[in-house]
């Protein structure tokens, strides 16, 4: 499975996001969103899409991998001020140029934005929309699904009933109880619930005074 950012268009996919300046001559440190770092070796030009503004093509002068990310040096970006203008931009390539996957593998960019439905017999219950994919939990990637609450759902063949990436729809048959409150929570959801519990406890203590 190739990981890419959720920020994609029909014609481009994001392979990195620029996070900070690096050095004094225009280099930028970028978070990787691809399992295929050789994409940077194969290309002399990349596309940069800022948070606000138009996508533009830049010539890649140099790159090296550093602390789990990649440092990029673009032609024409020569100073820290130049580099700061690229912060939070998406680094993209044309969709047609993305790496070929092994049979049965899936691009994260295809998963993100899909509506996920839990199937019970002939009934389909919408769980939410896939916002991201978490690879840090173990062998099986977890779909980060946001609906009434956030769920982490293993993306495994045994749960899959059907996928239609053109229609942005995934159907799954999930084990009983997986979507209940005692199901595994993401770190963000745990922190939110802890914060709510702390506020409730503090309110109770104030009433006792």
Curated annotation (Swiss-Prot):
Region named Disordered: 184-209
Positions of transmembrane segments: none
Domain of life (superkingdom): Bacteria
Occurrences of domain PRC barrel (ranges): 103-178
Main location, first listed in the record: cytoplasm
Chaperone is among the record's keywords: yes
Pfam families: PRC_RimM (PF24986), RimM (PF01782)
InterPro entries associated with the record: PRC_barrel-like_sf, PRC_RimM, RimM, RimM_N, RimM_N_sf, Transl_B-barrel_sf
Coiled-coil regions listed in the entry: none
GO-annotated cellular components: cytoplasm; ribosome
Family: Belongs to the RimM family.
Subunit structure, as described in the record: Binds ribosomal protein uS19.
Annotated function: An accessory protein needed during the final step in the assembly of 30S ribosomal subunit, possibly for assembly of the head region. Essential for efficient processing of 16S rRNA. May be needed both before and after RbfA during the maturation of 16S rRNA. It has affinity for free ribosomal 30S subunits but not for 70S ribosomes.
PANTHER family registered for this protein in UniProt: RIBOSOME MATURATION FACTOR RIMM (PTHR33692:SF1)
Domain-level remarks: The PRC barrel domain binds ribosomal protein uS19.
Protein name: Ribosome maturation factor RimM
Gene this chain is encoded by: rimM
């Amino acid at each position: 499975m190739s990981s890419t950012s959720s920020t994609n268009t029909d014609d481009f996919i994001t392979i990195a996001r620029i996070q900070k300046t690096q050095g004094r001559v225009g280099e930028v440190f970028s978070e990787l969103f691809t399992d295929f770092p050789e994409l940077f070796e194969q290309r002399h030009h990349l596309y940069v899409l800022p948070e606000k503004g138009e996508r533009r093509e830049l010539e890649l002068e140099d790159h090296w991998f550093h602390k789990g990310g990649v440092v990029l040096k673009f032609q024409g970006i020569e100073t820290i001020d130049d580099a700061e203008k690229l912060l939070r931009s998406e680094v993209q390539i044309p969709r047609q140029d993305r790496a070929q996957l092994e049979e049965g593998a899936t691009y994260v960019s295809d998963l993100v934005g899909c509506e996920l439905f839990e199937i019970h017999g002939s009934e389909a219950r919408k769980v939410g929309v896939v916002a991201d994919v978490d690879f840090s939990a173990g062998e099986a990637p977890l779909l980060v699904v946001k609906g009434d609450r956030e769920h982490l759902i293993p993306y495994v063949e045994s749960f899959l009933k059907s996928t239609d990436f053109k229609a942005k729809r995934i159907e799954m048959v999930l084990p009983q109880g997986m979507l209940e409150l005692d199901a595994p929570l993401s770190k963000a959801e745990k922190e939110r619930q802890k914060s709510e519990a702390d506020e409730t406890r503090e309110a109770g203590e104030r009433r006792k005074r």
